[in-house]
Amino acid sequence: MKFRTQMYKVVSWEQEIQNGINISKKIENAYAKEICIAMSKDSFMKDHKAPFDITIQVLKGSIDFGVLNQQILLKTLDSISLKAHEIHNLLALEDSIVRLTLYKYDSFGRVESVLKS
């Protein structure tokens, strides 16, 4: 008897918020990568940019999102899409969980390098 390969994966975005910023890859498929960014209150991701378009969604908490010399308040379930090469930054106003959607050819390592620089 031949069994069918599992065609789906259920992913929990619930994260324990630790001190600072922690990232993990949640989903990778033929189209995109989904990254979870857990940010403790007052943690900051300095100015950076992506080589492809991205989408950012706040799943929990609130983020002061800086882009194009503006500060935008993103609250739970708010999202924003950016074109490639737009410089942006994130400040967690409270413990927050952020969903980052990357183009399939972007890399998880690039996101990690933002935290290390």
Labelled PLM ranges:
Residues 1-31, 66, 115-117:
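A short, N-terminal "cap"/entry segment at the start of jelly-roll beta-barrel domains
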Residues 84-108:
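Ligand-binding loop in jelly-roll beta-barrel domains
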